[in-house]
């Protein structure tokens, strides 16, 4: 496993999103615009980000 992390920032509100997208945002630890979390860079996290890619911004950390 790599020790790389990604920083996920919520840039848009979840108003008008589907239930699946709202649940994904909550499971990532986000909830309001400008909230940030750092998660390990693995396929599971990348899959969650892909579901809500129009709501979040992703930065790779070293």
UniProtKB/Swiss-Prot annotation:
UniProt GO molecular function: structural constituent of ribosome
Cystine bridges: none
Entry annotated with the keyword Ribonucleoprotein: yes
GO cellular component: cytosolic large ribosomal subunit
CDD domains: Ribosomal_L30
Keyword annotations from UniProtKB, A to Z: Ribonucleoprotein, Ribosomal protein
InterPro entries: Ribo_uL30_ferredoxin-like_sf, Ribosomal_uL30_bac-type, Ribosomal_uL30_ferredoxin-like
GO BP terms: translation
Pfam families associated with the record: Ribosomal_L30
SUPFAM superfamilies attached to this UniProt entry: Ribosomal protein L30p/L7e
Keyword Ribosomal protein attributed: yes
NCBIfam families: rpmD_bact (TIGR01308)
Family under the similarity heading: Belongs to the universal ribosomal protein uL30 family.
Quaternary structure annotation from Swiss-Prot or TrEMBL: Part of the 50S ribosomal subunit.
Protein name per Swiss-Prot or TrEMBL: Large ribosomal subunit protein uL30
Organism: Prosthecochloris aestuarii (strain DSM 271 / SK 413)
Gene (name only): rpmD
